[in-house]
């Protein structure tokens, strides 16, 4: 800053964040959540994507940046991230549709296990040896090395197979895990050892997804939502940090 005046310090800080942040532009897209929530199916997703595009294009509106499938695709009884029977062909048909519409595809994933019964999901995952249960938060231990490896493999595979341009990572750490038998450190003031390890792991996940997309000459938008500290330093690794402001939705009253 050129002086210690608040306005100069603030400008210098904003310039610094702008310099380190991932390139970000205005983005317009559709997300399935407020239409269907978890009642999505391959059929109603395809119909809604098509109808929205038809309504926009018939009125001279350019294609959206992406169409996003939110929660509702996961088989939570399986013990790991996989597609339920409502999506018999996974997301192949839907991603082909978005390509035909001249736009891109996005997908939701809840690192801590979603918002239904993440405790049951996490326990099944632990039983299968694919992750660990966080007894403090009653969900998936998001710093467990086994889970990080397996979820990274799933994310990268999905990114490649479904040409994912936008990831909505929804729900990270509700409460730090204190289990010393897990493959992460514990202790420190405010559980700082777990928290630091967890975020270092996820930063590497974000980097790997970007590297994969960049390798193929493609872009990527990463949106962190829920149970995330709203720090501007995250913008080095993600494009947006979600803060809830949904008073305009019909069922919020």
Named regions from a protein language model:
Residues 61-253:
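Aromatic- and carboxylate-enriched substrate-binding clefts and catalytic-loop regions
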Residues 1-61:
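Carbohydrate-recognition beta-sandwich/jelly-roll modules
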């Amino acid at each position: 800053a050129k002086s210690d005046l608040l306005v100069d310090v603030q400008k210098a800080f904003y310039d610094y964040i702008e310099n380190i942040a991932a390139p970000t532009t205005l983005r317009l897209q559709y997300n399935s959540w407020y239409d269907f929530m978890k009642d999505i199916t391959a059929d109603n997703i395809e119909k809604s994507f098509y109808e929205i595009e038809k309504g926009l294009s018939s009125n001279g509106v350019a294609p959206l940046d992406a169409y996003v499938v939110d929660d509702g695709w996961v088989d939570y009884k399986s013990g790991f991230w996989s597609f339920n029977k409502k999506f018999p062909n996974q997301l192949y048909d839907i991603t082909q549709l978005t390509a035909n519409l001249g736009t891109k595809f996005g997908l939701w994933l809840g690192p801590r296990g979603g918002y239904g019964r993440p405790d049951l999901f996490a326990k099944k995952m632990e039983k299968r040896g694919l992750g660990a249960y966080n007894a403090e938060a009653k969900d998936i231990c998001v710093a467990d090395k086994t889970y990080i490896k397996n979820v990274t493999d799933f994310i990268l595979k999905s990114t490649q197979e479904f040409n994912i341009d936008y990831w909505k990572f929804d729900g990270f750490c509700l409460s730090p895990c204190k289990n010393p038998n897990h493959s992460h450190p514990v202790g420190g003031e405010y559980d700082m050892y777990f928290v630091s390890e967890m975020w270092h792991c996820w930063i590497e996940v974000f980097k790997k997804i970007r590297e994969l997309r960049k390798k193929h000459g493609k872009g990527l938008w990463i949106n962190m939502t829920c149970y995330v500290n709203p720090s501007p330093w995250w913008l080095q690794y993600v494009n947006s940090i979600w803060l809830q402001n949904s008073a305009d939705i019909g069922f919020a009253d």
